[in-house]
Amino acid sequence: MLPLSCEAFSFAVPFGVSFRFLPDEPAAAIKLKPGQTVMVDPTARRGGSCLEVLDGVARVYCPCEETEGMTLAFLQQGDQVRTDRLCSEGICVEALTPLSFRSDAEPLQGQGFDSVNEWTLQLLRIRHLGSAELRLHALLALLVNRLGRRCGDWCDLPFRITHERIGELIGSTRVTSTRLISKLRRQAQLATPAGQPSLRLAAALIEAAPVLG
């Protein structure tokens, strides 16, 4: 089966956010460019479907108006998401890097928590830390440890997150997120390499992050 590109999907604009609907027929490879999003309708197939990331990093979030795009998980190669276990309104999958995934995967059995449940638990723990600064510190460490790589005294995350999204993840306003990020820049603990979509963080910052358990 040939890979499908984002252009093959029907277009919709809910609540000011653009996405495309996932095709009803299972596909062995669907490709998205960074910033593109597909919505998965759990009612489109009896019993739902199982998505598996083949390459890249994705953000899974709830499309409900009430939750305003609440992040459920970040997924990378090998991670799966069962659509029948999530919001009845469906889920959205956003490509943070060039992304390839399949919608006809066989669910892994006997793995305990699935990828989405485990991520949601960790994000919930972060939201309960005492201050916005601690929550940001823990969030950056979680993302780097799960999705990034260490290069000497620095750690690289292969994508950037907007200040608005950081605010959603740590339960703060965009203004607070911007202030905290600016502080890390002044302390030379965070950098955004020119011409690259990545985020660079000091290894010492990641090592000193709060332990989530």
Residue ranges and their predicted role:
Residues 111-172:
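Polybasic "coupling" helices that flank or enter modular domains
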Residues 29-30, 39-42, 47-54, 72-73, ...:
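His/acidic/aromatic-lined binding-pocket segments of jelly-roll/cupin-type domains
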Residues 46-65, 76-78:
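Glycine- and acidic-residue-biased ligand/ion/polar-headgroup-sensing regions
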Residues 1-38, 46, 80-81:
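Cyclic nucleotide-binding regulatory module and flanking cytosolic helices
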Residues 39-45, 63, 83-85, 125-128, ...:
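Short histidine-centered beta-strand/loop micro-motifs
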Residues 147-213:
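Phosphate-/nucleic-acid-contacting segments
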